[in-house]
Amino acid sequence: LSMVMYIIFPWLYNLKEMGRWSVSRFLLTYFIIVISYSLARWFFGGRLGIGLDLFGLSIGLWIISEVLFKFWSPTFRWMSGFVGFIVAVVFGISLQEILSNLVEYWWIILFWVPALFSTSRPALTRTYTPWFFLGMFSYLAAFMIWLQGYPDTFYCQPDSWIQPHAIWHLMTALSTWCFFKFYRTERER
């Protein structure tokens, strides 16, 4: 639950800024998503009974909304959903795989959620270098380590001093710190 609570925050915050939401609307929406997710996961399992990985989708929604935040325009607003396919490819889901199995990947339609709610150019600006890119690099490096260090693999040896899972935790902590520093660069336009 904590990972989902963390990862929905950035894209929802971006929607708040581009949709001109009040803080109370933002928090209400955030807690409705968290509580709904918690209950659905409790009763229906990790894919919520509908084949939806909210954590994975939220990574895509964050990048989509971040690109839209940076390059907002009325036209790009509706094109921004296509960024989600690039994110999917980075995380190992090919466009061919998605298009050949739309029943499983039905959730790609949610790539356009940021476009629906991002009705205005953000009133804030952010500095992306170096913190955003360092955060992305450390997160993607952590993801690659995660793919190698799971049980019954060569790199997952419980008696070793070097544990990929522990390195993954350190790398994701570093990425979280970088993203914190990135959000601290926000300024009024």
Region locations from a protein language model:
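Multi-pass alpha-helical transmembrane bundles in non-GPCR membrane proteins
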Residues: 1-189
